[in-house]
Amino acid sequence: MLPEHLARISRRYVILLALVGLYVCYLFLPRWLVLACGLRRTLLSCHTCFLCEIVIPSHSTQHTSRNDKVKAWCLTSEYSLIGWYAFSGEMCAVINEWKGGEGFGIGRCFFKWRSDDVWRVEVVREYDWYGRIISRSIRDGAGSYRYQSRSDRDRSCFHHVFHHCPSAFYHLACANLVRSCGDLRWIGMANLNLYTVTAICVRWRVTKPLTGARITAVLCTRALEFIWYRLKRVRPASLFHQLFHHLRRPFWNLLRQTGCPAVAGRTRIGMAKSYICLVLPRNAAVGGGCLDDIIDPQNNKQSPGSSEMEAAFAVTKAAANRASCRKIPMLHIGVSWGCRSIRRIPEFIYVIVLLILSTKHKQIAVLNRPKDRCEASVGIILDPREFVIMSWLFPVSNSVIRSQFHTTYRAGKHKVNTWCSHLIALASLRGFINFSVIYHGSSLNENYQKSQDAGEHAVLLLYSPGPMAQQHCGIVAQEGGDVCGGLYARACLGDRSLTVQRLSDYRVSYQRLRLLEQLRAGRILATALGAKLPRRDAACAGCVAHGVGGDVWRRVLVRAACWRQISYSAAIVNLMWWRSHDDEYSYYARLDCSSRLFCWGHVRKIPEWVICHSFLYY
């Protein structure tokens, strides 16, 4: 028998070898098995409705189709299909009417509203793992898709999602979307060119506190990630210094910015609910085109299927824009990859971290941007009272960010990488990068002079109100760009000093009269609708309309409806009237209808300026 101290050492080596063996096995095991053994059991239990708190049980998801190649694309139970694109019946009925009775679809899963109050699913295309179309079949409830009887459906997610919760989008129907996917890569682990654009949130009950062990696990993961990718590139003398700063921010956020009572030892944050948000690629390919091309009103080369993606983009972008809430402290755990000099973190570490954190009182936001080299970011929010936030997780160099920034912001092509820019802006707020470097330099003029999205660029500068923001705002305006969008965001953030005169000062040499006219029109329109919006908001509406003529309708109507200052029915009537008079901007009406899913019933849960900002751009 070994001595006690040798026995302890032996046990440690056995545990270490076991972990190494598990990792080796993980490298060779199919990912669906990893998901089934770990993440699936952790995440896919009962959860509650986002709005009405009704417990939704998990249901059996036996696949009727055994084609493994399309399992991740074609989710063959009605619960899973709802998870792809969960709209309320009224919403889909409206879209169905606009599309001439064709229904509304996304990618290959096609939903259609029928008079007998049953959802019929039509598979219009099926894809293999590489995105190639392998069949073009149409199926309904009598074929591959199993439907319950009406009595059974009353107790199912199928009934609950579409009939009890107005914001059905927030449901991951019975949590089957992740389960049926069967591959961790769907969560953003690989550069799959997904054919779906949506954002899905799951809410489930948690009871375990945040313990020192979990804090240690997060910090150790951060340290491992640092050592894994930076040890070979860092001088030994500066290794400790950089490691310290690499760990300091998440630890500081964890212990000092939770807004909780004194944090010491074991910590319990006073929240009994949690979220996991999966935001799939905004620029998913549809019909051979990029979503940036599809929804661009100035782009005449719209790809096939664009009408099926517009509302999806609205909902997804609204979720992304909510990430601008800079008031929430965040614990950065170093789970990000693909951004130029940053290589992919081993999936094994990602899985372990996700398993550790998935059932705790936190919120996880996963982003996947395969075409932009900003493929994924994960942020753990310590105050889940807010909705969703994105974060740039690495203190990458200014040169890397500047290169990425100017690569994706192309002059005159109306292709603005908004999501990556949100991350960059948030990174500047977190102190990771010097944001001013991005907007200074020789490329400023050539990138902004012809761009129609300078207002959107200015928004990113105005995340941090102050003299620097005003300075940059003036720079963009002098270059001839449309700064109205930035001023709109700034006003929504609470700068009540933005008067008509100050707005016009930014545009001294560029269409000053037109701006003043539209500011006045926005104020008159808001008053006529009975919205009683503050002066700053009416001015914002007119200012944003400067870039797109009919845009003032969208801004004022939707915002007023969301703030309960006018009824939603009044807003939608006006939007439809606008659509009938101006087909050029008809797609805005569909976007606004989708936006209802983000404002209906959530006004009391989300700060006013976040709602305002969520409709800043699509």
Swiss-Prot record:
State the Gene Ontology BP annotations.
killing of cells of another organism
Keywords assigned by UniProt, alphabetized: Cytolysis, Hemolysis
Role noted for this protein: Bacterial hemolysins are exotoxins that attack blood cell membranes and cause cell rupture by mechanisms not clearly defined.
UniProt-recorded name of the protein: Citrolysin protein 1
